[in-house]
């Protein structure tokens, strides 16, 4: 179907988002066209504001509007326990259960040789530097229970073995192939409680 150029560009923009195919992009584009102009402007401002004002924490790699982030800056947090997750959204999922009191390290990805992503392409070098500089006693590997997440957890555990730092892996109450962000608080809580040393 041939659309006027502004609609085509809007559809193309929506298709750049993960999980949005052509049909959904068309629906979203026409939804935006039906919105009040003020709502569209607010939406556009929110996008620009998020892009301009959010950054990654220089300590843990979590997305934040200040540096260090509110978690790293919280003196009540147990700085000796670092939970390693793949994405900022995984931190949000872990925080929802309101049980974990340590800090995080966000890798912003996972090792995936098929996609050409190696250890140097994600936040692993920063993790190693952080572990040298801080007095960390335990690293909890909370990467996703899929092939890439498991490979990443195994790689990190082998790297940390000589350091003497206790390395644990969250238990799998999580479905294999699933993502942390979709797990409910109870499942995440049980997975954290049942972590094992690796």
Swiss-Prot record:
CDD domains: TOPRIM_recR. A zinc finger (C4-type) spans 57-72. One of its GO terms (molecular function) is zinc ion binding. Keywords: DNA damage, DNA recombination, DNA repair, Metal-binding, Zinc, Zinc-finger. Residues 80-175 form the Toprim domain. It holds the Pfam family RecR_HhH. InterPro entries: DNA_Rcmb_RecR, Rcmb_RecR, Rcmb_RecR_Znf, TOPRIM_dom, TOPRIM_RecR. One of its GO terms (biological process) is DNA repair. The keyword Calcium does not apply. Belongs to the RecR family. May play a role in DNA repair. It seems to be involved in an RecBC-independent recombinational process of DNA repair. It may act with RecF and RecO. This is Recombination protein RecR. It comes from Bacillus cytotoxicus (strain DSM 22905 / CIP 110041 / 391-98 / NVH 391-98). The lineage of its organism: Bacteria, Bacillati, Bacillota, Bacilli, Bacillales.
């Amino acid at each position: 179907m041939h659309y006027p150029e502004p609609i085509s560009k809007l559809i193309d923009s929506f298709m750049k988002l993960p999980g949005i195919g052509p049909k959904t992009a068309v629906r979203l584009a026409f939804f935006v066209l039906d919105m009040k102009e003020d709502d569209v402007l607010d939406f556009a401002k929110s996008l620009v504001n998020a892009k301009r004002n959010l950054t990654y924490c220089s300590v843990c790699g979590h997305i934040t509007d200040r540096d260090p982030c509110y978690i790293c800056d919280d003196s009540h947090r147990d700085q000796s326990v670092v939970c390693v997750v793949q994405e900022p959204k995984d931190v949000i999922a872990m925080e929802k259960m309101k049980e974990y009191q340590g800090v995080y390290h966000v890798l912003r990805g996972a090792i995936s040789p098929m996609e050409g992503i190696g250890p140097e392409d994600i936040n692993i070098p920063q993790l190693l530097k952080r572990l040298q500089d801080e007095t960390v006693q335990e690293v909890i590997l909370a990467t996703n229970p899929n092939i890439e997440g498991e490979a990443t957890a195994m790689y990190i555990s082998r790297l940390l073995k000589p350091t003497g730092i206790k390395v644990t892996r969250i238990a799998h109450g999580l479905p294999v192939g699933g993502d942390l962000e979709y797990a409910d608080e109870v499942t995440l809580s049980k997975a954290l409680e049942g972590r094992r040393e690796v």
